[in-house]
Amino acid sequence: MSRRRHDFDHDQIVSISYEKDISINRLHYDKRELADSLSNAELDLIQGIQDFMLEKVSQSQWILEACPTSNIYIGRLNNYHEHPIFRWTPPNRENLNPGGSSNKFGIRTGAVRVCINTDDAGLMPTTLENEHRVIKQCAMIYESVSESDAHQWIETIRRTGVEVFRSNHLNWSNTV
């Protein structure tokens, strides 16, 4: 009895998508399409694991680099305001309080340090100044922070980026 190997099943379509309020009536099944769903409990588990990992990253003092335009072009984001930078280091610090939107289960003790970059300037139609501007605007519109608070938040992110650049690139060149 022969069995087809999964890596030869090219007629199978695997699609992963998320819709917040999908109803079973909206799902359609096609013999060639694989479908799955997650319960609210499973989504909570995933968010809890993500919060645990973000806390580990924060405690290890690692810095996450965000490339928003690149993530829009080649990632699964449709809009800048969906970028996880707003969860990693929320512009509204109250969101990190236990039960807040960035700390639903009270696992996290603080923000993750982040910097913003442009990724590959030859491929991505943006500048560092534009990345900061767009993310700042999203903070004001979607995270409901004042222009002053959004400016301070972006300035902290910008300083982190400069600090990382200097430590990675300038220290070794000054010793030559």
Walk through the language-model features, giving the residues of each:
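Mid-to-C-terminal alpha-helical segments outside catalytic/metal-binding sites
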Residues: 51-60, 129-130, 134-176
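Hydrophobic alpha-helical scaffolding
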Residues: 39, 43, 78, 118-125, ...
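Short acidic/histidine-rich active-site segments
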Residues: 66-69, 110-128
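Histidine/acidic-residue-rich catalytic or RNA/ligand-binding cores of hydrolases
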Residues: 74-85, 124-137
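Short, structured coil/loop segments at alpha-helix boundaries
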Residues: 48-50, 67, 83, 121, ...
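Histidine/acidic residue-rich metal-binding segments in metalloenzymes
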Residues: 1-63, 80-113, 139
